[in-house]
């Protein structure tokens, strides 16, 4: 990672920092850093920003507990903007929302037959951050990895039974349940779906060669 002196801060001594969930790729917030907050971020491996309204440093999650573990920092070609990849321990927004940005689906995304996987990954990440009462995903995260693994095993068994019985109606429902629980497991492990897809792409390219 670059040192502060290698970056281009603006005339106010600030640099914009886009904060992104390292696993779901969801943009969580846009904040600003000065040299001191950037250096503290490097030192503590948690996000620190500079509040323009309060004219002071602030450590994300210092009062709420919703800290952001820094997994990587990228900078743009002009070295005057940052992309901070994080693993959030809770909501990013002061309103209690997972992200400070609302999700608006475009027609192009709606037409993507696999777009639902990305959307589901985003919703699961949102549930983990916000932990809304009554949500099944909240229940799974509270119970922990053993419960999630048990559900993955159960759903895999039900997929096998449905396939063995040649019951296509049951199979599609059980397959959907299995995919959902796999995504929950990936989130619990902080493993992006993109990493799994990259393996598939690599294997496909090897077959094509």
Swiss-Prot record:
EC number per UniProt: 3.5.4.19, 3.6.1.31
Database matches in SUPFAM superfamilies: all-alpha NTP pyrophosphatases, HisI-like
Provenance organism: Bacillus subtilis (strain 168)
One Pfam short name: PRA-CH
Alphabetical keyword list: Amino-acid biosynthesis, ATP-binding, Cytoplasm, Histidine biosynthesis, Hydrolase, Multifunctional enzyme, Nucleotide-binding
GO MF annotation, one: ATP binding
Family annotation (HAMAP family): HisE (MF_01020), HisI (MF_01021), HisIE (MF_01019)
ATP-binding as UniProt keyword: yes
Highest taxon, organism lineage: Bacteria
GO biological process, one term: L-histidine biosynthetic process
Hydrolase found in the keyword field: yes
Protein name per UniProt: Histidine biosynthesis bifunctional protein HisIE
């Amino acid at each position: 990672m670059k040192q502060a002196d290698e970056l281009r801060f603006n005339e106010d001594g600030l640099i914009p920092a886009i904060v992104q969930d390292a696993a779901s790729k969801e943009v969580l917030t846009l904040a600003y850093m000065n040299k001191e907050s950037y250096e503290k971020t490097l030192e503590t491996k948690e996000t620190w920003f500079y509040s323009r309204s309060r004219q002071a440093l602030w450590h994300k999650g210092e009062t709420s507990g919703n800290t952001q573990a820094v997994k990587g920092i990228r900078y743009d070609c002009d070295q005057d903007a940052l992309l901070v990849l994080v693993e959030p321990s809770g909501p990013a927004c002061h309103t209690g929302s997972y992200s400070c940005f609302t999700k608006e689906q475009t027609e192009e995304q709606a037409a993507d037959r696999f777009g639902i996987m990305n959307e589901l990954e985003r919703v699961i990440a949102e549930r983990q951050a916000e932990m809304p009462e009554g949500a099944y995903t909240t229940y799974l995260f509270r119970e922990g990895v053993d419960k999630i693994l048990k559900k993955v095993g159960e759903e895999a068994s039900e997929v096998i039974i449905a396939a063995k019985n040649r019951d296509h109606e049951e199979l599609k429902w059980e397959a959907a349940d299995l995919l959902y629980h796999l995504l929950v497991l990936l989130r619990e492990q902080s493993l992006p779906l993109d990493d799994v897809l990259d393996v598939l792409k690599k294997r496909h390219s090897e077959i094509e060669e």
